[in-house]
UniProtKB/Swiss-Prot annotation:
Compartment(s) where it occurs, according to its Swiss-Prot or TrEMBL record: Cytoplasm
Reactions accelerated catalytically: 7-aminomethyl-7-carbaguanosine(34) in tRNA + S-adenosyl-L-methionine = epoxyqueuosine(34) in tRNA + adenine + L-methionine + 2 H(+)
Listed Pfam families: Queuosine_synth
Subunit structure: Monomer.
Gene Ontology terms describing biological process: queuosine biosynthetic process; tRNA wobble guanine modification
Pathway assigned to this chain's UniProt record: tRNA modification; tRNA-queuosine biosynthesis
Protein name as annotated: S-adenosylmethionine:tRNA ribosyltransferase-isomerase
UniProt xrefs under InterPro entries: QueA (IPR003699), QueA_dom1 (IPR042118), QueA_dom2 (IPR042119), QueA_sf (IPR036100)
Record's keyword annotation contains S-adenosyl-L-methionine: yes
Major localisation: cytoplasm
Extent of the signal sequence: none
Keyword set, alphabetical order: Cytoplasm, Queuosine biosynthesis, S-adenosyl-L-methionine, Transferase
Family per similarity comment: Belongs to the QueA family.
Length: 346
């Protein structure tokens, strides 16, 4: 299975840099079996069935992009930092520009209330130890940081105050992600209430999406790719809700690839169980899904692990046809783009 098998041509004009307004006005490509329909997210009320269960990732994106100053003698230099994940040894793993000029022991000052020491430096990242912890760190980070927009958006415009709302789901509660679970960005409170009134169930899980979600696949044989690890949790109550839905014949539908990867990790033994820890599950064609019946997700990058995941769910040829339709019909791609609802089998 070659990396080139997951390539496709995407016109740059289809890369969304702002979301649809309102959120539910985004377009929705409904692919059920061999059928494709062009709909909108607001139509989900008539698409989902009573007894369906949506699995939502309730992680909260932190303002992980920081701009600071490194002082060496009389000289000052600007440093751009993106937090990646908490480090096992304490502090945060982070990417920095310019990384090569930073040295262990140096201090980067981000604001009057927030500084960090370079504790360790690797080839591609470093470990920072901040001078604040707990609630004091959260408050200082909120003041000094900016939303960590994906590279394909950040290359086209700078983050602004609108992203603080746009790049956060309406049910975000547990801070720790440095990228949004973007399929969930399409939901607003009225849509959630309308779905609940139709007896569609909701289960919340937590997967703190890491910066590794944007890393390219660098091997041609995709089966040898190693995934980045991300921390997640499926509580006992969440596992019980999902198991009850399966037992009752309902469909379990993760909203986003992060929710899907998490519940499949929690069902590695065959049945969904409470689970907590780091997952590096890599789903590509040939994978046997254990609890997932369908998936709502945005449109993904060429040659990405997420494109491999949806190909595992729907089949490679089917995904090629779906993405060809999306490009020909001007669907908007990636984090702020439109959505798809993928239902295998039909």
């Amino acid at each position: 299975m070659q990396l080139s098998d997951f390539d496709f041509d995407l016109p740059e004009r289809l890369i969304a840099t702002r979301p649809a307004r309102p959120r539910t006005a985004a377009r929705l490509l409904l692919a059920e079996g061999d059928r494709i329909e062009d709909r909108h997210v607001r139509d989900l009320v008539g698409i989902f069935r009573p007894g369906d269960r949506l699995v939502l990732n309730n992680t909260r994106v932190i303002p992980a992009r920081l701009t600071g100053t490194r002082t060496r003698g009389e000289a000052e230099a600007r440093v751009e930092v993106t937090l990646m994940e908490p480090a096992a040894a304490g502090g945060w793993r982070a990417m920095a520009k310019p990384l090569r000029k930073l040295k262990p022991g140096e201090t980067i000052r981000f604001s009057d209330a927030l500084s960090a020491e370079v504790a360790e430096k690797g080839e591609t990242d470093l470990r920072l130890v901040f001078d604040r912890a707990g609630a004091a760190f959260d408050a200082a980070l909120a003041e000094a940081g900016a939303m960590p927009l994906p590279p394909y958006i950040a290359a086209r415009r700078a983050p602004d105050a609108q992203d603080d709302e746009d790049y956060q789901t309406v049910f975000a509660r547990h801070a720790g992600a440095v990228a949004a679970p973007t399929a969930s960005l399409h939901f607003d409170r009225p849509l959630l209430e309308a779905l609940a009134a139709r007896s569609v169930g909701f289960t919340e899980v937590t997967l703190h999406v890491g910066a590794g979600t944007f890393l390219p696949v660098k091997v041609e044989d995709v089966t040898t790719h190693r995934m980045h690890a991300e921390w997640g949790e499926v509580t006992e109550a969440a596992a019980a809700e999902i198991a009850a839905t399966k037992a009752a014949g309902g469909r379990v539908i993760p909203v986003g690839t992060t929710a899907l990867r998490l519940i499949e990790s929690a069902a590695a033994s065959g049945a969904i169980r409470p689970w907590r820890g780091e997952t590096d599950i890599f789903i590509y064609p040939g994978y046997r899904f254990r609890v997932t019946d369908a998936l709502m997700t945005n449109f993904h990058l060429p040659k990405s692990t997420l494109l491999m995941l949806v190909s595992a769910l729907m089949g490679q040829e089917r995904i090629r046809a779906i993405y060809d339709h999306a490009v020909r019909h001007d669907y908007r791609f990636f984090s702020y783009g439109d959505a798809s609802l993928l239902i295998p089998g039909g």
